[in-house]
Amino acid sequence: MTASQEPVDQAPESNEPAPAVPATVEALQAELAAVRAELEAAQATVAGQQEQVLRARADAENVRRRAQEDVSKARKFGIESFAESLVPVKDSLEAALAQPDQTLEALREGVEVTLKQLTGAFERNLLKEIAPAQGDKFDPHLHQAISSVPSDQPANTVAQLLQKGYAIADRTLRPALVIVSAGQA
């Protein structure tokens, strides 16, 4: 045979070792059993993880539902303290109206006592008056300017208070209505 007549299907020689091939059926069955055991372990892990995810979702849903219930209760009963503070004020007004033949002075004293009760109720519930004095700097977060007038007061200060405002804690419920100074005429 010459070099041109050699069979073509022979693979070129390689220095790499041939892949390890299991020699027996028993070895293949042992390897298959090991792979099946790994698969079962992985499936058990996945099932456990899925169970944990379902529990976490259920817990999150329970927390969300409880939070909604708490918010609903807070809205419903949030003014309970304030309402309790106002009941004595209403009682005083009703008692004053029930008195026959009151003098103007007695009526005035009753209104003053009732105003003190109402002011106390406001204070207990953090409702504060916004009543800027003449000459206080105009604050658009606390005051509402109705007009601007020439005044002896410096510009952008309160020239006159028309109506008190109110705030709960640091939140303005109603700004004070004021006339603002435009400065010297």
Swiss-Prot record:
One of its GO terms (cellular component) is cytosol. InterPro entries: GrpE, GrpE_coiled_coil, GrpE_head. Residues 1-22 are annotated as: Disordered. It is found in: Cytoplasm. One of its GO terms (molecular function) is protein-folding chaperone binding. It comes from the Bacteria. One of its GO terms (biological process) is protein folding. Disulfide bonds: none annotated. PROSITE patterns: GRPE. Pfam families: GrpE (PF01025). Keywords: Chaperone, Cytoplasm, Stress response. Belongs to the GrpE family. Participates actively in the response to hyperosmotic and heat shock by preventing the aggregation of stress-denatured proteins, in association with DnaK and GrpE. It is the nucleotide exchange factor for DnaK and may function as a thermosensor. Unfolded proteins bind initially to DnaJ; upon interaction with the DnaJ-bound protein, DnaK hydrolyzes its bound ATP, resulting in the formation of a stable complex. GrpE releases ADP from DnaK; ATP binding to DnaK triggers the release of the substrate protein, thus completing the reaction cycle. Homodimer. This is Protein GrpE. The lineage of its organism: Bacteria, Pseudomonadati, Pseudomonadota, Betaproteobacteria, Burkholderiales. The gene is grpE.
